[in-house]
From Swiss-Prot:
Predominant location: cytoplasm
Residues at which L-glutamine binds: D74, Y218
Binding site for ATP: 42-44, 48-54, 237, 285-286, 293-295
Motif ('KMSKS' region): 292-296
UniProt KW Nucleotide-binding keyword: yes
EC number of this enzyme: 6.1.1.18
Disulfide bond annotation, renumbered to this chain: none
EC class of the enzyme, as a word: ligase
The protein, known as: Glutamine--tRNA ligase
This protein's record includes keyword Protein biosynthesis: yes
Length: 580
């Protein structure tokens, strides 16, 4: 697994976004001597491109400042979580090129969180409430009206402690009681109106089994897990800005650094005891046009079979982007290019595509392929003519070496490279016209062969024998150059032409009554059967090529093999989407 280390990061130009400036100041003032961050996904789905920004920031910051980053599975909602999602998350983080200092689960800390909740009860800072969820919403109030205190808000600490322990013992059914923080029902911040800290949920947990009939709420568990792990800077997106006062309330009132007895369960697990007073810092989330990133909507796309699974190359999951042919380097370049700020904005999808083009232009070997093949027969060559031509694997990188490519009397060319009635400015083949065959010589079309329906099925032509490589006529000027594949040697391949999943910039915009389902791009996937040169077929899955003049393609991660090649188009050679 490739890693982004501190050494790698420091070789890069210094980044000066506001988060890194805060960290530099904290280090300079002695607030912290060692930086610790975390990436805390919930294992209830696959990571998407928005998570890539958080991953690059969390792990990148730690590496740049010589610290470390923890990968924590936020597994507090077992009814929606699955070990398969947890495994995919680890795979995605590794694929992006990052290595976690430790792998943790919020469930590792359930005993500590329970003891912390008992402390809050004893301190008079939490109470057991008998209101159901609908009543809680009613009592909470609105943005313009203060909330009302629960009838059970003034229970004594002893009664609350007894009830909470009964909740822990599994005495009560789901939804009948919650443990709530006692903060301020009149607060202008609704998150501080006595939020729930624990709820009853008799659900088996993937890691703890049936040990726990109660589970901590996100805000409580997240804040204290950061504190338990000694996190110095808890980086999250802007929608959590209003949750920061609650985050600080949990951290400060439990006060783990000064209540080390609460950490005793960590000793049994062999975990370090390095509690901190973490600081939450918010940054803008990643928004890209032509996409949806809501987990609910992505799930609907899969469940309704509008796409072919979570790793469909049209999906914006990291699994899907990887299968499409996006590289870790391109993803990291994209995150670096869009930067880190507090201002929400929508990034044009072309920025992501250009990062991939830039990366693949440097690393992808060149190959020839035809996706809409048309046969060209060079009638002045012998029927058994065969020779091996030498081509560079990359025109700008001699270190990638060369390959041999067979050349024969019958070739496959691209159907779009011939026109009987050419438009103005046409530079490719026409009846009686000439074109250069890449690396092979200059050819002319003498005859257009059609079937009974009038469809063109072949071209017959002539290869100028004086224009072969190394001959003087090879320098003769012609207007166009086209690619080709030797027909007897070509390998048939399935080629999947992927494009953007949605046809409009804002698929989430329902102002015209249409939902994201109504604006799916009908041409987001086309499957064609073409021909590739032999050197392209004999390669492993997830290997990228530039098919000359066609775009960047990758061997499919799951379906490709040498006997039955399958290629996915990762991105076109240039941006073909017209902006409004």
């Amino acid at each position: 697994m490739s890693e982004i280390t501190s050494t790698d990061a420091r070789a890069q130009p210094e980044k000066k976004d506001f988060i890194r400036q805060i960290i530099r100041e904290d280090l300079a003032h002695g607030t912290h001597t060692h930086i610790r961050t975390r990436f805390p996904p919930e294992p209830n789905g696959y990571l998407h491109i928005g998570h890539a920004k958080a991953i690059c920031l969390d792990f990148g910051v730690a590496a740049e400042f010589g610290g470390h980053c923890t990968l924590r599975m936020d597994d507090t909602n077992p009814s929606k979580e699955d070990p398969a999602f947890a495994a995919a998350i680890q795979d995605d983080v590794s694929w992006l090129g990052f290595h976690w200092n430790a792998l943790r689960h919020t469930s590792d800390y359930f005993e500590v969180l329970y003891l912390a909740a008992e402390k809050l009860i004893t301190d008079g800072k939490a109470y057991v409430c008998d209101l159901n969820s609908e009543q809680v919403r009613e009592y909470r109030g609105t943005l313009t009206e203060a909330g009302r205190p629960s009838p059970w808000r003034e229970r004594s600490p002893d009664e609350n402690l007894e009830l909470f322990r009964q909740m822990r013992a599994g005495t009560f059914p789901d939804g009948t009681r919650t443990l709530r923080a006692k903060i301020d029902m009149a607060s202008g911040n609704i998150n501080l109106r006595d939020p729930a800290l624990y709820r009853i949920k008799h659900v088996e947990h993937q890691n703890t089994g049936n040990t726990w009939p109660i589970y901590p709420m996100y805000d409580f568990a997240h804040a204290l897990s950061d504190a338990i792990e000694g996190i110095t800077h808890s980086l999250c997106t802007l929608e959590f800005e209003d949750h920061r006062p609650l985050y600080d309330w949990c951290v400060n009132h439990v006060d783990l650094p000064n209540n080390s007895h609460l950490l005793k369960p960590l000793l049994d697990k062999g975990f370090p005891q390095e509690p901190s007073q973490p600081r939450q810092i918010e940054f803008s989330r990643l928004n890209i046009n032509y996409t949806v990133m809501s987990k609910r909507k992505l799930t609907a796309l899969v469940d309704e079979k509008l796409v072919e699974g979570w790793d469909d190359p049209r999906m914006y999951t990291l699994q899907g982007l990887r299968r499409r042919g996006y590289t870790p380097a391109a993803m990291r370049l994209f995150v670096e290019r869009i930067g880190i700020s507090k201002q929400n904005s929508i990034i044009d999808f072309s920025v992501l595509e250009n990062c991939l083009r830039e990366n693949l232009d440097t690393i992808a070997p060149r190959r020839m392929a035809t996706i809409a093949p048309l046969k060209l027969v060079l009638t002045n060559l012998p029927e058994d003519h065969e020779e091996q031509l030498i081509f560079p694997n990359h025109p700008k990188d001699d270190t990638q070496g060369t390959r041999t490519m067979p050349f024969s009397r019958e070739l496959w060319i691209e159907r779009d490279d011939f026109s009987e009635i050419p438009p103005k400015g046409w530079k490719r083949l026409v009846p009686g016209g000439e074109v250069r065959l890449r690396g092979a010589g200059i050819a002319r079309v003498d005859e257009v062969v059609k079937n009974a329906a009038g469809d063109i099925i072949a071209l017959h032509g002539w290869l100028d024998p004086t224009s072969r490589p190394g001959m003087e006529g090879a320098h003769r000027k012609v207007k166009g150059t086209i690619h080709w594949v030797s027909a007897p040697h070509a390998v048939a391949a399935e080629i999947r032409l992927y494009d953007r999943l949605f046809s409009v910039e804002k698929p989430d915009d329902n102002t015209d009554g249409k939902t994201y389902r109504d604006v799916l791009n009908p041409d987001s996937k086309r499957v064609v059967h073409g021909y590739i040169e032999p050197a392209a077929a004999q390669t492993a899955p997830e290997h990228a090529f530039q098919f000359e003049r066609l775009g960047y393609f990758v061997t499919d991660r799951h379906d490709h093999d040498a006997a039955h090649p399958v290629f996915n188009r990762s991105v076109t050679l240039r941006d073909t989407w017209q902006r409004d």
